[in-house]
């Protein structure tokens, strides 16, 4: 999904309709698009006027995050990377975003893969990952399930450093956890 950049002069609805039609063999009619847009904005409890505003221009942090999920819902990618989608969301907005992510996971099943990056357990409590990985210097150093998130939440990352004997440089102290919420395995056998 695109980064939440402001694009003056391009309305949210024009951007989304163009992006949706670029992914389809036959373009959506205006009626079909409006129906899909209305349904998705209603699911995300977004103001319907958002469609007529310029893309991300003047959007609050929460509106940008919901707009990213709106794009995901309408574009229906096979794979999505949500980088700190919980950043700047209040409790209610986080629940709405998580509910919409879970709905996509439920309805798309094996046709949708998702990687979420967050520094906070609260997102992972609402969107339960199937796999959890801890990265240091771009390398996966620890893998597990939800219990790994609980351990990190309770003990921090200090145990990772001690257990694996990892010495982090000052600029490398930002360890990031990633929860993979779905994956599709294919084989060429």
Which functions belong to the PLM regions below?
Residues 2-78:
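ABC-family P-loop ATPase nucleotide-binding domains
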Residues 115, 131-133:
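Conserved catalytic/dimer-interface elements of ABC ATPase nucleotide-binding domains
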Residues 90-95, 143:
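Conserved D-loop-proximal element of ABC-family nucleotide-binding domains
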Residues 1-7, 118, 135:
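Short beta-strand-to-coil loop within P-loop NTPase ATPase cores
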Residues 81-88, 92:
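Walker B catalytic motif
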Residues 154, 160-189:
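ABC-family P-loop ATPase nucleotide-binding domain
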Residues 100-120, 124-126:
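Conserved catalytic loops of ABC-family nucleotide-binding domains
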Residues 126, 135, 139-164:
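Conserved beta-strand-loop-alpha-helix hinge in the C-terminal portion
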């Amino acid at each position: 999904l695109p980064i939440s950049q402001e694009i003056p002069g391009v309305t949210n609805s024009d951007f989304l309709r163009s992006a949706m039609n670029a992914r389809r063999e036959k373009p959506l009619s205006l009626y079909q698009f409006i129906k899909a847009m209305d349904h998705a904005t209603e699911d995300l409890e977004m103001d319907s006027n958002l469609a007529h505003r310029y893309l991300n221009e003047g959007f609050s942090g929460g509106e940008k995050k919901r707009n990213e999920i709106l794009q995901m819902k309408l574009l229906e990618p096979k794979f999505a990377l949500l980088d700190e989608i919980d950043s700047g969301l209040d409790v209610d907005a986080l629940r709405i975003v998580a509910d919409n992510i879970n709905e996509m996971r439920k309805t798309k099943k094996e046709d949708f893969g998702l990687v979420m990056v967050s520094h906070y357990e609260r997102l992972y409590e609402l969107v339960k990952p199937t796999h959890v990985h801890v990265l240091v210097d771009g390398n996966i150093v620890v893998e597990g399930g939800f219990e790994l998130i609980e351990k990190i939440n309770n003990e921090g990352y200090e145990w990772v450093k001690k257990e694996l004997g990892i010495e982090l440089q000052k600029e490398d102290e930002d360890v990031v956890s990633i929860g993979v919420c779905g994956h599709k395995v294919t084989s060429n056998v």
